[in-house]
Amino acid sequence: MSSSQDKQSKWDSVKRYKLNKMISKLGNITGHGTELVTVYIPPRRPIYDIVSQLKNEAGTASNIKSDLTRNHVQDALSRTVEHLKLYKEPPENGLVIFCGAIPTGKGIGTEKIEIYSVVPPKAVQINLYRCDDHFWIDHLKDMMKDDKVIGILSLDTQEAGFGILTGDRWE
């Protein structure tokens, strides 16, 4: 069994179910403004780089005109920085953090800052920071897709072509 298959076997059906449920929950959350922070951290990216970037973004967030949105973004960023202090380095597959002011009732002012941290089933390939009215879950959804390898062979009387299809990627 190869090492990638061994790593994948660690993600049993219960973990996969819980992560799919969390992705579904996060996908249904929308903020009142650009109050929801998404951070994807690759496995070899130093945590202090991400902390520095987020502190810089917190300074930039002070320019947001709406008091409520500014406070929510700054609170989410500071909560994310505090959460990252729990790690000396990213986990083996990287880390994905979702944090923001999530509405608990109807109307503005009912939001509560919540944070969700995920160690994905596959290595995070991108370094991403987004502050938006929704969480950026597409990359995490892609990691959850089945990635069986399919070989495709096309024969003609004069030529032949071979390709490999892995998930939704063609080589």
Language-model-detected regions and their locations in the chain:
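Non-catalytic, solvent-exposed interaction/assembly segments
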Residues: 1-143, 149
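Gly/Thr-rich phosphate-binding beta-strand-loop-beta motif of the actin/hexokinase/Hsp70
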Residues: 146-170
